[in-house]
Amino acid sequence: MATNFLVGEKIWFHKFKYGDAERRFYEQMNGPVAGASLQEASMILHDIARARENIPKSLAGSLGPGASSGPSGDHSELVVRIASLEVDNQRDLAERAGEELARPLGHSPADPAHVSHAPSGAPGQEASHTSRG
C-alpha cells in the first residue's frame, strides 16, 4: 500500500528531460560551455598569429616605393604602438611565467626572505670563538 503513491509519479520516468532542462538553465545562467569558450579562444589566438604575420608584410609594403604620405600611408604611430604593445606583452608573459614557476616553491624569486642565512650560533662561528679564548 505504501508503494501505490509512486504509480502516479512520472518524474523518475522522465528524469532525463528534467536533467536536460536543468543543464540548459544553468548554462544560460553561467554563460557558454567551457568547450565552446576554448574553441573561441583558439580561433582568436589563430587570428592574432595571422595578424602578427601580416603586420610586417603590410608595413614593408607601405614603406616601399610609392607609399603615400596621406592617412593610409602614415603608419609611424601605429608601428610605435604595436612595438610598445609587443614589449608589454612579452614582459607580462615573462612575469606570469616567473610567478607560475615560483608558486610551487612558495616564494617569489624577487623575495629576499627565501635566502637562508646561517644562524648566529653556527658551528663555524663557535669554533672561532673557542680557539681565541
Curated annotation (Swiss-Prot):
Bias kind Low complexity: ranges: 58-73
Ranges for region Disordered: 58-77, 89-133
Compositionally biased intervals (Basic and acidic residues): 89-102
Protein's UniProt keywords contain Protein biosynthesis: yes
Keyword field: Elongation factor, Protein biosynthesis
GO molecular function: translation elongation factor activity
Family the entry assigns: Belongs to the EF-1-beta/EF-1-delta family.
Protein name (record): Putative elongation factor 1-delta-like protein
Organism the protein comes from: Homo sapiens
Gene: EEF1DP3
